[in-house]
């Protein structure tokens, strides 16, 4: 016969049935309990003690629990690991409950909906995706800031790139996505996939500026958030449409290879452009700066508007210093507003709001003192919100704690009734002190004192040796080993007055605070607008600080121009890491008639750094930053495409060469004459002749059909002859100094092709064995003594012959052809060389 389930456990099972994919935290008194598999799994993940309910039964129920006051910490751990957590609260006072206490889930916390991200200034985006008629709609939201946007995309790769750039951790996927696409999100991108199949009619978004698909996906996202959060979300901003074509387009591979916001080694901020440019002082400014780097501008007027203000801040050191001090006093207004909306704001949050608002007049004053036209718009948008700051300053005590149940929140003078209760408490304390002194005098018991505990209330404490002196009007409350506790009618009367005052004071103070929280909600929109203005000011002062610190100059950007002229350019991040004195600057010149720069030179000589330097300079200029150069004249680029180094493909487990070709194809298909293309060693992932042929064909295609400004680094020195056939291609190389058998890489870009690759020298630096290096040098000399055909590479119709061996060499040649040297380890390369030697 099956064991009977208790009403409490049946209630748990009924609730759990509605949240099968979440850990259910079930409030029972002072603990949140977990049962069954949730308990087993949570005990392991959170290192909790696993116990059991009904231990003596045949099937004890696994159980684990966490104290209610520490629950947030445990919830954060689960959410950080990608789990959902449903929180079931007691919906009535257990003391007043008839039968089982009513319980219900009040919130489902997920990786994409958590707002308690106090230790991070980063956005926490939740994304929804849908697909219809060959178009994808993508909407994203940050519940912690209220940001809510939507766009439409034509390719799945663009969807993947957008999600990766947003660093989203959870997606709400439509049923129109196929299984392979869902696997990309779940397995390759490690995203939590949630569903929202129904959209309540009252949550349907129908904005005229959005397509039907955009309205649908934004509605789906809103419905999911409402369903999981179960509360008013007044801080959510109206959904805003955006187009990726309105910004400098860069796919995720480009952002990753250029290390804009995350480094490749650790996927962290250090050593990135974001790290370099971040001198922001507010959390909102930090988030906005990251979004600027992710989405540089393509409107020259908008770029110049930013640069004008950067220039003003750069020219006024003392005013900027005062501005920075004022910004330091501004807390995270966006997240504070969200906490108010969520009903999670505590007294300290309101003090932070008031302190933040108190710094706004100073910021406004400094902008006014600068008296510059470009600052007028920002100055006019600085809303001091005096009504809110006045309300908080009059209501909240400067010494208020983080909790709302311990009292001491509301200032004296804010509420007359509360002041009366507090006066009663203060009088009661003096009454008790007077009563204690009077009874000591009357009874002659010098050790008599009045104490308090929850069980006995107020009582007279009298030791065993003094019991004979206890007066008749005392009555016994409790007997201890060495003392006894007594009460009196007068003490009881004082206690009743004090307890009533304390209880009513606590209740009234709580109600007053909740009223303040509700009243503050009407200012959320103004707080969010203020936050955006302060964030923009913060970003611009940050760019000016970096420009001053690093010695940057204001670039000249010209609409419609195709001239690139950078004098003394530097790689911004490399220079910051290694120091300006050690960095070798380079000019970058692509005149009107030059579209392609073919770059040759040995490994480790600086080709990749040179190309990345150019891309970063363009990005910096188009976010409104000054740039690392002596002078810089640039066109406005509409997109940057890169193929730099081997990288993983988010969409599938493709080979390095397949990734190379896919990224090259993406650039070829999407680039325009206003784009920047950077190809580093394209074609190295396959056999030599295949790679060379493809590299040449790609160069010719870009030259003849696209006309984009292109930097193309290659080890195929044969390609340098292309400058004779292609009018818009120039050769440059990295200069080297060869002296007494030693080679020094000068890291300087010079006109013309390289005459040597110095691969053996690089191998020497890498520490390959000396016998191997000597053998390689002999082979190289033999190869160099065999002249190549004089005909231009551009006109070749058949595969080049690198060298001639003996009549029995065909087997060796085939071995070399089949070998993909780029994918060989050092050990494999060494073994292969010795194998070839033995065959000669």
From Swiss-Prot:
Alphabetized SMART domains for the sequence: MUTSac, MUTSd
Q: So what does this one do?
A: This protein is involved in the repair of mismatches in DNA. It is possible that it carries out the mismatch recognition step. This protein has a weak ATPase activity.
Give the molecular function GO annotations.
Answer: ATP binding; ATP-dependent DNA damage sensor activity; damaged DNA binding; mismatched DNA binding
Family in the record = Belongs to the DNA mismatch repair MutS family.
Tell me the protein's name: DNA mismatch repair protein MutS
* Bilayer-crossing regions: none
Instruction: Write down a Pfam family by its short name.
Output: MutS_I
Q: Which InterPro entries match?
A: DNA_mismatch_repair_MutS, DNA_mismatch_repair_MutS-lik_N, DNA_mismatch_repair_MutS/MSH, DNA_mismatch_repair_MutS_C, DNA_mismatch_repair_MutS_clamp, DNA_mismatch_repair_MutS_core, DNA_mismatch_repair_MutS_N, DNA_mismatch_repair_MutS_sf
Q: Which NCBIfam families match?
A: mutS1, PRK05399.1
The gene is mutS
What keywords appear on the UniProt entry? Answer: ATP-binding, DNA damage, DNA repair, DNA-binding, Nucleotide-binding
Name the CDD domains for this protein.
Answer: ABC_MutS1
GO BP of this protein: mismatch repair
Signal peptide residues on this chain, from the entry's feature table: none
**UniProt-listed SUPFAM superfamilies:** DNA repair protein MutS, domain I, DNA repair protein MutS, domain II, DNA repair protein MutS, domain III, P-loop containing nucleoside triphosphate hydrolases
């Amino acid at each position: 016969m099956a064991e009977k389930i208790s009403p409490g456990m049946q209630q748990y099972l009924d609730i759990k049935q509605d949240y099968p994919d979440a850990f259910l935290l079930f409030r029972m008194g002072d603990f949140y309990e977990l049962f069954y598999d949730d308990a087993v799994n949570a005990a392991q993940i959170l290192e909790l003690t696993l116990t059991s309910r009904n231990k003596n039964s045949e099937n004890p129920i696994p159980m684990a629990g966490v104290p209610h006051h520490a629950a947030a910490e445990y919830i954060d751990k689960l959410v950080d690991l990608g789990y959902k957590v449903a929180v079931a609260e007691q919906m009535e006072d257990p003391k007043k409950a008839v039968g089982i206490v009513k319980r219900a889930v009040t919130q489902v916390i997920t990786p994409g909906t958590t707002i308690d991200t106090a230790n991070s200034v980063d956005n926490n985006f939740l994304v929804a995706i849908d697909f219809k008629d060959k178009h994808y709609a993508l909407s994203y939201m940050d519940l912690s800031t209220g940001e809510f946007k939507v766009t439409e995309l034509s390719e799945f790769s663009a969807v993947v790139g957008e999600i990766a750039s947003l660093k989203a951790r959870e997606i709400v996927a439509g049923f129109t996505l196929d299984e392979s696409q869902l696997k990309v999100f779940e397995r390759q991108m490690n995203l939590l996939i949630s569903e929202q199949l129904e959209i309540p009619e009252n949550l349907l978004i129908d904005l005229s500026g959005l397509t039907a698909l955009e309205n649908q996906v934004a509605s789906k996202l809103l419905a999911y958030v409402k369903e999981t959060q179960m509360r008013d979300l007044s801080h959510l901003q109206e959904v805003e449409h955006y187009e990726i074509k309105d910004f400098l387009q860069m796919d995720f591979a480009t952002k990753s290879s250029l290390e804009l916001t995350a480094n490749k080694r650790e996927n962290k901020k250090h050593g990135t452009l974001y790290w370099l440019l971040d001198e922001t002082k507010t959390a909102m400014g930090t988030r906005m700066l990251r979004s600027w780097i992710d989405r540089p501008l393509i409107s020259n007027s908008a770029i110049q508007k930013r640069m004008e203000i950067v220039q003003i801040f750069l020219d006024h050191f003392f005013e900027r210093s005062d501005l920075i001090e004022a910004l330091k006093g501004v807390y995270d207004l966006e997240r504070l507003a969200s906490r108010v909306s969520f009903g999670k704001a505590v007294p300290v949050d309101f003090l932070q709001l008031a302190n933040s608002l108190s710094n706004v007049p100073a910021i406004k004053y400094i902008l006014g003192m600068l008296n510059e036209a470009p600052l007028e718009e920002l100055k006019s948008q600085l809303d001091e919100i005096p009504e809110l700051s006045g309300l908080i300053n009059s209501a909240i005590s400067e010494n208020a704690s983080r909790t709302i149940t311990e009292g001491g929140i509301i200032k004296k003078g804010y509420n007359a009734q509360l002041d009366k209760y507090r006066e009663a408490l203060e009088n009661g304390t003096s009454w008790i002190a007077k009563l204690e002194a009077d009874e000591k005098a009357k009874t002659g018991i010098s050790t008599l004192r009045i104490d308090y505990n929850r069980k006995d209330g107020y009582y007279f404490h009298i030791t065993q040796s003094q019991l004979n002196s206890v007066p008749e009007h005392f009555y016994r409350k409790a007997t201890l080993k060495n003392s006894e506790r007594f009460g009196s009618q007068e003490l009881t009367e004082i206690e009743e007055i004090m307890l009533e005052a304390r209880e009513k004071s606590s209740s009234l103070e709580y109600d007053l605070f909740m009223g303040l929280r509700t009243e503050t909600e009407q200012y959320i929109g103004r707080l969010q607008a203020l936050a955006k203005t302060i964030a923009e000011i913060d970003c611009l002062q940050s760019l000016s600080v970096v420009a001053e610190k690093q010695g940057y100059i204001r670039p000249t950007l010209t609409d419609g121009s195709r001239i690139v002229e950078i004098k003394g350019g530097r790689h911004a991040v490399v220079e910051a890491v290694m120091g300006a004195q050690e960095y070798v600057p380079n000019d970058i010149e692509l005149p009107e008639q030059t579209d392609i720069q073919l770059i040759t030179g040995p490994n480790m000589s600086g080709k990749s750094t040179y190309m990345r330097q150019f891309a970063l300079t363009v990005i910096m200029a188009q976010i409104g930053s000054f740039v690392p150069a002596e002078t810089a004249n640039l066109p406005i680029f509409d997109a940057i495409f890169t193929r730099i180094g081997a990288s993983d493909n988010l969409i599938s487990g493709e080979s390095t060469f397949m990734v190379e070709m896919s990224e090259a194809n993406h650039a070829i298909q999407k680039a325009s004459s206003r784009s920047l293309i950077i190809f580093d060693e394209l074609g190295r992932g396959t056999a030599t002749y295949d790679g060379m042929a493809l590299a040449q064909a790609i160069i010719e295609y870009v030259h003849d059909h696209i006309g984009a400004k292109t930097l193309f680094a290659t080890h195929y020195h044969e390609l340098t002859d292309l400058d004779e056939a292609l009018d818009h291609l120039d050769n440059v190389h990295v200069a080297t100094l060869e002296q007494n058998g030693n080679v020094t890489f000068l890291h300087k870009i010079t006109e013309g092709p390289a005459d040597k690759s110095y691969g053996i020298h690089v191998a020497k630096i890498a520490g390959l064995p000396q016998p191997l290096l000597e053998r390689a040098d002999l082979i190289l000399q033999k190869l160099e003594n065999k002249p190549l055909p004089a005909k231009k590479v551009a006109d070749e119709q058949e595969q080049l012959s690198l060298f001639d061996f003996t009549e029995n060499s065909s087997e060796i040649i085939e071995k070399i052809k089949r070998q993909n040297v780029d994918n060989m380890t050092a050990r494999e390369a060494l073994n292969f060389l010795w194998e070839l030697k033995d065959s000669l």
